[in-house]
Amino acid sequence: MPVDTYNRRVNGLRKDIVELLKNMNASFFRFPGGCIVEGITRETALRFKNTIGPIWERPSHWLMWFYRTSNGLGFHEYLQLCEDINLSPMYVINCGMTCQHRKPDYFEEQLTDIYLQDAINAIEYATAPVDTYWGGVRDANGHPEPFSLKYIEIGNENYGDEYLAFRSAMTSSRKVSSRA
């Protein structure tokens, strides 16, 4: 990661890149994108908790574009970036399947529940008070105040019964729970 970063953020992006993004005058920023959320296989589908904490401890994996991600720009850095340049974050979550436009793999209920909980944990990390588990992790990572996270994208261009079942489970999750 660069040393000379925008707002001197630890693990932040280069100033010139952030200035270009800022000058676009966008209103929101989608992260981590689409296909990266789904992964090539269920093992490479993105998990929120693999994108926070010390960069050298974050697992890397192959992407469908034939290179590896370091997860160097993780969820926390993304939320800070949005805060720094006044963008509304739109977090993309896995909806219980790999890419439907390649060889789709629909997760069984137990694994789908793990990804549902992962999404709930990410939302808690971003928005909950510090006396919750994930709010406390955010505080330990240097940001005691909740981030402004209003938008969640469920899946990436997904469709069908499996998608609708996950969407229904996600939208009916009224209570954010703190399971790691």
What are these regions (language model features)?
Residues M1-A180:
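Non-catalytic accessory regions flanking glycosidase/transglycosidase catalytic cores in CAZymes
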